[in-house]
């Protein structure tokens, strides 16, 4: 991979919540996390850990792969 290519991992948590009619507040209550943390994840400002992604997938009853979008830039 060249120096100007890197893998960027983005989540589609905001879309997954919207598809199920769920809110950031609902997810924060399910996971015991702050709404601010959920908001930052949804905005892709920070990424949840793999463990957290597994917990989110479980709560939303989706495959963890459905929460990720891999792009190259």
Which role fits each region the language model picked out?
Residues 17, 28, 57:
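The alpha-helix within a helix-turn-helix
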């Amino acid at each position: 991979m060249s120096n100007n290519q890197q893998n960027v991992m983005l989540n589609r948590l905001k879309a997954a919540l919207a598809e199920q009619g769920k809110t950031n507040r609902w997810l924060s209550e399910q996971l015991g996390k702050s709404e601010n943390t959920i908001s930052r994840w949804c905005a892709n400002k920070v990424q949840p850990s793999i463990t957290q992604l597994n917990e989110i997938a479980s709560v939303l009853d989706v495959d963890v792969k459905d929460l990720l979008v891999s792009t190259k830039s």
